[in-house]
């Protein structure tokens, strides 16, 4: 009788897998429990002025010098920025700096691209007025300082301008290259977008992108 009971116990218990600590494992859906985190950290592709950029955080440095009003570029900037920012998911982060004789930042810290922050940044960019010199250097450094505070893995910086950096009557191209190189200790890609019809600023914008692992783009 005892032998029969042992056989019956073995038949009923043996089909169930038991983990090393004696607990039966739980049934998990295919892919495990980490799918949500992977989706949250996935990079996004944005289209800004016709150029495509992939990342999970985007930081703009935007020219608002007087020449940006000559052919309506400042209005185009506002439209392009609005469309691009609205395309970001709330998982992405971003920052915006605008420059002319001086520079101003929408926020000194990187922010999530949630509806409230996107609305605030769009309203801020829409209020920009074109005036003054093209003092890019300090603005680019400020943009990098904001980006450096972001913990995302695929950060991208986008510099938009319609010419070489002239500040208070002097060409500051060499100084800008040096200042950006010193500030970019995280080696964030610095992508440049040159929107002028002439070729005056192409060489500088190409060099700025090349020295910082970015791309140069000139819309046609």
Regions found by a protein language model. Give the residues of each.
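…and closely analogous acidic/polar surface helices at protein-protein or active-site interfaces
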Residues: 49-58, 66-96, 110-119, 134-135, ...
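Von Willebrand factor
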Residues: 104-105, 109-155, 189, 193-204
């Amino acid at each position: 009788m005892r032998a029969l009971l042992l056989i019956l116990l073995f038949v009923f218990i043996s089909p169930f897998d038991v983990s090393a600590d004696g607990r039966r494992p739980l049934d998990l859906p295919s892919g495990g429990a980490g799918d949500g985190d992977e989706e949250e950290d996935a990079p996004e592709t944005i289209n800004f002025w016709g150029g495509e950029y992939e990342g999970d955080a985007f930081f703009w440095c935007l020219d608002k010098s007087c020449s940006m009003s000559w052919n309506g570029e400042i209005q185009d900037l506002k439209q392009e920025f609005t469309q691009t920012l609205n395309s970001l998911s709330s998982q992405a982060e971003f920052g915006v700096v605008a420059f002319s004789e001086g520079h101003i930042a929408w926020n000194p810290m990187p922010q999530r691209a949630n509806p409230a922050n996107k609305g605030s940044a769009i309203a801020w960019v829409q209020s920009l007025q074109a005036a003054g010199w093209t003092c890019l250097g300090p603005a680019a450094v400020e943009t990098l300082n904001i980006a450096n505070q972001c913990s995302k893995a695929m950060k991208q910086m986008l510099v938009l301008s319609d010419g070489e950096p002239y500040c208070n009557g002097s060409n500051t191209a060499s100084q800008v290259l040096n200042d950006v190189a010193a500030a970019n200790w995280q080696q964030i890609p610095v992508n440049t977008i040159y929107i002028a019809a002439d070729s005056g600023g192409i060489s500088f914008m190409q060099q700025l992108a090349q020295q910082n692992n970015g791309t140069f783009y000139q819309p046609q």
